[in-house]
Amino acid sequence: MRLVIVLCLGATAVLGQAGNATLIRELEQRPDLTFIRTKQLSCKVKKFKPRLDLEFRLHTGYWVEIPFKELIGPETVWRMQLVVEPISPESAQPETIEQFVETGAVPETVKGTVEMSGSFAVGEGSYRATWHLTERFGRYCSVAWDVDAKRGRRDRDVPLALEPGEIRPARQYLFRQEEPVDRSLAGGDLNLKVFLNLDTGSRRRATVRPWLIAPMVAVMRTLFRRPEFGEFALVAYSQEDQKILYRSDYGDDFDFQAMGSAVRKLAPATVDFRDLARDSESNFIEELLSDELRNDDRADAIVFIGYEHWEGKKIPKERVTQLDLPRASVFYFNFAWHPWNSTLGKVVREWGGSQFRIRSARELLQAVEKVVDDTMVAR
């Protein structure tokens, strides 16, 4: 048996019964409180190397394992505290991550381990991380390790979002708005239209998994930050539900919060009987492209983003050619395992577009660079 507890910056998780909820609130208001330490527990830490994520941050984390036999006793409240101190550069400021967790009574018959994990993002540099677990009955454990955060040899030319020595939460609000971009020096006169397929897997799955949405949002953010683009249009849709969930005409930014609302409209566990009709999904894509591109003479670049796991029947070539061939450059960021077997993949190929499979920040940066370069040349 293994229980997993996750620690993130700014998060408070309460497990078990709510009997200690008032105590937890009181403890959260006492950051200076020191728990008495009388019995040291056996615990060990496993860490993972910092990796460059699609937000262009070095992301690192850890797992701490404690045998359940060490936790035998009545229900209690634990305080987990992670202190990350920059070693170099020395001028950087340390950060403290704290979380209170309530656990129910642990009987003597229970076996296995409890795993407590957490993560954070840093800029390049060296850090000392110290993790403490204490509880009000005096049990405690502490582990420490060093973190050496740097870009790999192949990523040396990839710019980072965090300064050396900077420490930030691993998790960010997925649909936060972007800061304005100064587009004056680069012209900012290219128009970008994005088709975003919000399906991330089987329609039988009851929930939408945010970590599968995150790479698609990262593509949109990287495109938005390019100063060559000045206006943006978005069509967010579900191929499985066969409907448009959100649409915005050309404007000076993407409305990420509205896109988040569109994601919450998804109902992947619900299947309409009309969705089961033969070729219904390919017909939906054909109609979507026809309606959206017929009268759009503003787009300089058309970008499709999404997962397409369904290997549907190919739209007949004669029907693809009947669609108005976009005057814009066409690109597809496809996160599926077999991208060219998807309906959209076949259409993009017929249109002579470029397709990308993104697995790293470097690949994302290179793909967006190609989108900009090809669009400027074609224009």
Regions found by a protein language model. Give the residues of each.
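Sec-dependent N-terminal signal peptides
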Residues: L3-A13
